[in-house]
UniProtKB/Swiss-Prot annotation:
InterPro entries: Cyt_bc1_su8, Cyt_bc1_su8_sf. It comes from the Eukaryota. This is Cytochrome b-c1 complex subunit 8. The gene is UQCRQ. Gene3D superfamilies: Cytochrome b-c1 complex subunit 8 (1.20.5.210). It comes from Bos taurus.
Length: 82
């Protein structure tokens, strides 16, 4: 079975580091570096990402409009009904 909790297996060549929660900041440089970096990265890739989304939106709206038109009845087919 397993070993007791105080006598666990030693793991060699594993180094861990820790920092006290009192010595670290929650959001360092969040507004000064984070938001400008997001804007820079967005501007860098917008021309690769936006065209497929725009094309999909146009095809989707066209398809939805065509579907709604195809559900309507043709009034000319019912002119002579009484």
């Amino acid at each position: 079975m397993g070993r007791q909790f105080g006598h666990l297996t030693r793991v060699r060549h594993v180094i861990t580091y820790s920092l006290s929660p009192f010595e670290q900041r929650a959001f360092p440089h969040y507004f000064s570096k984070g938001i400008p970096n997001v804007l820079r990265r967005t501007r860098a890739c917008i021309l690769r990402v936006a065209p497929p989304f725009v094309a999909f939106y146009l095809v989707y709206t066209w398809g939805t409009q065509e579907f709604e038109k195809s559900k309507r009845k043709n009034p000319a087919a019912y002119e002579n009904d009484r």
